[in-house]
Structure formats: C-alpha cells, structure tokens
Amino acid sequence: METTAIIRGVHISAQKTRLVADLIRGKSVAQALNILTFSPKKAAGILKKAVESAIANAEHNDGADIDELKITTIFVDKAQSMKRFSARAKGRGNRIEKQTCHITVKVGA
C-alpha cells in the first residue's frame, strides 16, 4: 500500500529540488531522513518535511510499520512562476520570474 504526501507551491525552483530528490529515491525512510538531515541545501529541509508527512500519513491512515517503509516514488513538478519587476538603469525594467514547485512523495513497504 502506498501513502502519499503532497506539498504545493513551494518557493524554490523544481530544478534545484530535483537534485536533492534524486539522492533519496528508492531508499528506506530512515536512510532518506539521515541524508536530508545532513544535506546543506535549502531543498533538503523542505523534502524532509514532506517525507515526515508521508511517514505520519502511512502510520495514521494505513497503520503501516515505519521500519519497513521506503520511498517508492518522489517527483517534483514545476508550478506557477511569480512575475516580478526589477528596476534597471535609464528608466527601464526587467521581469524576474520567481519559480515555485509541487513536491509529491509516496512511501510504501
């Protein structure tokens, strides 16, 4: 049985988050949490929160044993970009796109 946790609209680019997600794909949840705890990247903290949520969902909703769980699926999708304006020289302006992403984590035995 797979249990899912989804975090939507995270303020970090999907490209940066996928780098960390690739490190924990297919690992046991204990090993994945250990990797995320000691990773210096911002995305690691966000993914750790998602993995912990998936573990809690599996324990509460499905009555799963935490020691047997592993990350079966993890993917990061691009979400909406926030368009912002940045003032430049001589009265001009540039558009800045602040990226967001959706994170989906599935855990199972």
From Swiss-Prot:
InterPro entries cross-referenced by the UniProt entry: Ribosomal_uL22, Ribosomal_uL22_bac/chlpt-type, Ribosomal_uL22_bac/org-type, Ribosomal_uL22_CS, Ribosomal_uL22_sf
Keywords: Ribonucleoprotein, Ribosomal protein, RNA-binding, rRNA-binding
CDD domains: Ribosomal_L22 (cd00336)
Gene Ontology terms, MF aspect: rRNA binding; structural constituent of ribosome
A single cellular component GO annotation: cytosolic large ribosomal subunit
Superkingdom of origin organism: Bacteria
Pfam families hit by this protein: Ribosomal_L22
Gene Ontology biological-process entries: translation
Role, per record: This protein binds specifically to 23S rRNA; its binding is stimulated by other ribosomal proteins, e.g. L4, L17, and L20. It is important during the early stages of 50S assembly. It makes multiple contacts with different domains of the 23S rRNA in the assembled 50S subunit and ribosome. The globular domain of the protein is located near the polypeptide exit tunnel on the outside of the subunit, while an extended beta-hairpin is found that lines the wall of the exit tunnel in the center of the 70S ribosome.
HAMAP family documented for this protein: Ribosomal_uL22_B (MF_01331_B)
Family according to the record: Belongs to the universal ribosomal protein uL22 family.
Assembly information from the UniProt record: Part of the 50S ribosomal subunit.
Name of the protein in its database record: Large ribosomal subunit protein uL22
UniProt source species: Bordetella petrii (strain ATCC BAA-461 / DSM 12804 / CCUG 43448)
